[in-house]
């Protein structure tokens, strides 16, 4: 996909956490069974995709950044801390009554970050991320390296399709 620099169009960049920033696939079975103490002890099995840790740090110098996740806040906060991710805000499962694909989690993040929908973009790896973005009135970018195939993500018609985390540099820096 051809990338056009969007640096002046957005003030805030929001991300999904699991399988967009962090490959947490090794924790899925434990998370489904709600074995949280075991999950926290297995963070060493997770990894940040590509150079996303460095990219997030660079993005945070020019944009407000945040994570919008369907994961519990305690888990998300600990995972963010474990990987030392440079973000401004977190909107997690317990922060809203309704969850993606409902727009409430993204709208909550926009409120916390003191922005407006037309000043934000949301980056996620699932169709529900793209649907939630559209419902919240924000631009969307599908991360093709996550849990759903590029065909699945593309079926939701994201505004942008990212092949690798490095595409974020092309778009925003």
What are these regions (language model features)?
Residues 1-48:
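Active-site neighborhood of HAD-like aspartate-dependent phosphohydrolases
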Residues 6-8, 61-63, 113-119:
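Glycine-rich phosphate-binding loop signature in dinucleotide/nucleotide-binding domains
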Residues 12, 103-130:
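Conserved Lys-Pro-Asp/Glu-containing loop-to-beta segment of HAD-superfamily phosphomonoesterases
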Residues 20, 69-71:
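Conserved phosphate-coupling serine/threonine residues in phosphotransfer and NTP-handling enzymes
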Residues 40-67, 77, 81, 103:
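Short, acidic loop-to-helix structural element flanking the phosphoryl-transfer center
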Residues 53-61, 110, 130-134:
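Surface-exposed amphipathic alpha-helices with a cationic face
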Residues 86-100:
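A short, structured active-site edge motif that brings together acidic residues
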Residues 121-161:
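Acidic, Mg2+-coordinating phosphoryl-transfer loop and its flanking beta/alpha structural elements
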